[in-house]
Amino acid sequence: MKTDNSTFLAQQIVRLRRRDQIRRLMQRDKTPLAILFMAAVVGTLTGLVGVAFEKAVSWVQNMRIGALVQVADHAFLLWPLAFILSALLAMVGYFLVRKFAPEAGGSGIPEIEGALEELRPVRWWRVLPVKFIGGMGTLGAGMVLGREGPTVQIGGNLGRMVLDVFRMRSAEARHTLLATGAAAGLSAAFNAPLAGILFIIEEMRPQFRYNLISIKAVFTGVIMSSIVFRIFNGEAPIIEVGKLSDAPVNTLWLYLILGIIFGCVGPVFNSLVLRTQDMFQRFHGGEIKKWVLMGGAIGGLCGILGLIEPEAAGGGFNLIPIAAAGNFSVGLLLFIFITRVVTTLLCFSSGAPGGIFAPMLALGTLLGTAFGMAAAVLFPQYHLEAGTFAIAGMGALMAASVRAPLTGIVLVLEMTDNYQLILPMIITCLGATLLAQFLGGKPLYSTILARTLAKQDAEQAAKNQNAPAGENT
């Protein structure tokens, strides 16, 4: 009996020693091994949650569409039901954001940028459930939003959660795991690991602290999230447009013209986003009831729009291959483009939990395809393929709006598996970025972050002014 007790005690002592060794390793924040191990954990978690989010959104969409199919033969039921279902789903998202986690509204990417500079708080315990469930509601309603913004914010918050769980206290670990989660989130959303890395390095370059450990951690997290994504979804590109022909050298000037067009469109689009945000803010004034009802009305309209013109609703991933294949006329492409600009502004600027990457990619595809089809008529001697201009346009609007040309180029090439178009992509995206900068356009996410910080400072100043005199001394 004594032998059994001594054996049990010895086993317990060994377990406790192992736990203590692991705990001490994790608390040595500057140990590269500890941070890289945590980066792998963050990347794996982000990949799993990203896949779960994608499946959950698809499930909600299928349930909604299935309910509409059941009454498809009864128009007097179909139209009201389409409005009501989408309105209710959207209202869930708006309510959760406004009531429990206002920082979960919109794409969430500016929040991560602010957190990397220690200017915005990361409250993962409330952002994670609100962003996940709220995103299920708004994206499931058929609103013109993407899932990449939510997965980037979810990934960043998972990074902070892991940091808190393992009690890693250094500023370097806090910064590195937050950036790792954000990069892994973009990779998990688009199956684009290299774009996830470039997004952190390029788009978040003012906030990201370059050093050997942080770069290795970002690489590690992105690798793990990509592996998880491919285990569940396979290795095929998420946008199937087929293998397009190369762009002959004598046609490259046309891609520069396309870049110039997007260089003009990008700043205008950004300005419209900000103006629409101001319009919604004046309308609801922060009042939750008005905000939720407004969101329900927008969601319901998207539900109706999905019946009238399915291509004008939703994130746009289903629209991109159809448009790139040249199945629409130039006039119809421009009509859908204008319609989706309006719906993108309404959905994104209203503060719904959802991203703007996917809608921008769809807009770029529409305008790029229209340009390619028109160029094919004007220059028949070139034997142009409109799909190549669609691919170039996908990255160009993002480059002009977000001011991240490298990320736009690599993201589109990874998503479509058309790496042979890298030269026209570079020409188009570089032209769009340079002209947008020349015209005075500001990067969209940086501008949104600046407005958020200004609002935060104003609220803090008002709070300090209203506080009793004794509290300020």
From Swiss-Prot:
UniProt topology in membrane: Multi-pass membrane protein
Keywords attached to this entry: Antiport, Cell inner membrane, Cell membrane, Chloride, Ion transport, Membrane, Transmembrane, Transmembrane helix, Transport
Highest taxon listed in the record's lineage: Bacteria
CDD domains documented for this protein: EriC
Gene Ontology cellular component terms for the protein in this record: plasma membrane
TM region positions: 33-69, 77-100, 124-141, 148-166, 215-232, 253-281, 288-309, 330-349, 355-376, 422-438
Keyword Transport attributed: yes
Cytoplasmic compartment segments: 1-32, 117-123, 167-176, 202-214, 282-287, 439-473
InterPro entries: Cl-channel_ClcA, Cl-channel_core, ClC
Keyword field contains Secreted: no
Record-listed chloride binding positions: S107, I356, F357, Y445
Any one GO molecular-function label of the UniProt entry: voltage-gated chloride channel activity
Motif Selectivity filter part_3, chain ranges: 355-359
Chain ranges for the short sequence motif Selectivity filter part_2 as given in the UniProt record: 146-150
Residue positions of motif Selectivity filter part_1: 106-110
Cell location: Cell inner membrane
Regions of this protein lying in the Periplasmic compartment: 70-76, 233-252, 310-329, 377-386
Intramembrane segments: 109-116, 177-189, 193-201, 387-401, 402-404, 405-416, 417-421
UniProt catalytic activity: 2 chloride(in) + H(+)(out) = 2 chloride(out) + H(+)(in)
One Pfam family linked to the record: Voltage_CLC
Oligomer status and interactors: Homodimer.
Protein function: Proton-coupled chloride transporter. Functions as antiport system and exchanges two chloride ions for 1 proton. Probably acts as an electrical shunt for an outwardly-directed proton pump that is linked to amino acid decarboxylation, as part of the extreme acid resistance (XAR) response.
Family, per entry: Belongs to the chloride channel (TC 2.A.49) family. ClcA subfamily.
Official protein name in the record: H(+)/Cl(-) exchange transporter ClcA
Origin species: Salmonella schwarzengrund (strain CVM19633)
